[in-house]
Swiss-Prot record:
<dbReference type="Pfam" id="PF02694">
    <property type="entry name" value="UPF0060"/>
</dbReference>
<keyword id="KW-1003">Cell membrane</keyword>
<feature type="transmembrane region" description="Helical">
    <location>
        <begin position="29"/>
        <end position="49"/>
    </location>
</feature>
<feature type="transmembrane region" description="Helical">
    <location>
        <begin position="6"/>
        <end position="26"/>
    </location>
</feature>
<keyword id="KW-1133">Transmembrane helix</keyword>
<keyword id="KW-0472">Membrane</keyword>
<protein>
    <recommendedName>
        <fullName>UPF0060 membrane protein Ent638_1931</fullName>
    </recommendedName>
</protein>
<feature type="transmembrane region" description="Helical">
    <location>
        <begin position="61"/>
        <end position="81"/>
    </location>
</feature>
<feature type="transmembrane region" description="Helical">
    <location>
        <begin position="85"/>
        <end position="105"/>
    </location>
</feature>
<comment type="similarity">
    <text>Belongs to the UPF0060 family.</text>
</comment>
<dbReference type="InterPro" id="IPR003844">
    <property type="entry name" value="UPF0060"/>
</dbReference>
<keyword id="KW-0812">Transmembrane</keyword>
<keyword id="KW-0997">Cell inner membrane</keyword>
<dbReference type="GO" id="GO:0005886">
    <property type="term" value="C:plasma membrane"/>
</dbReference>
Length: 108
């Protein structure tokens, strides 16, 4: 389960980077050349999703919980926003949901 969780975090990081770089270009006037690493990050994101040993719908559902946690870490580290108690509670609920889904992968 730890390997799966780490793979989800890597997947989420690729998705966030792949979306953040075009955001920098569109909102902050950064170089258009950021679209190239953004495209690479998004392609890596898609490839990483294929490495999970479950049906795609289950993978996407479980991945959503980890994405929430990763996005909140990004909010704290990159955007410099202090997380609220609601952020932490939401992350905990999302992560618990992911763990429940992943725990059932081999049982169905």
């Amino acid at each position: 389960m730890i390997k799966t969780t780490l793979l989800f975090f890597a997947t989420a990081l690729c998705e966030i980077i792949g979306c953040f770089l075009p955001w920098l270009w569109l909102k902050r006037g950064a170089s258009v050349f950021l679209l190239l690493p953004a495209g690479i990050a998004l392609a890596l994101f898609v490839w990483l999703l294929t490495l999970h040993p479950a049906a795609s719908g289950r993978v996407y559902a479980a991945y959503g919980g980890v994405y929430v946690c990763t996005a909140l870490l990004w909010l704290r580290v990159v955007d410099g926003v202090k997380l609220s108690a609601y952020d932490w509670a939401g992350a905990l609920v999302a992560l618990c949901g992911m763990l429940i889904i992943v725990a059932g992968w081999g049982r169905t």
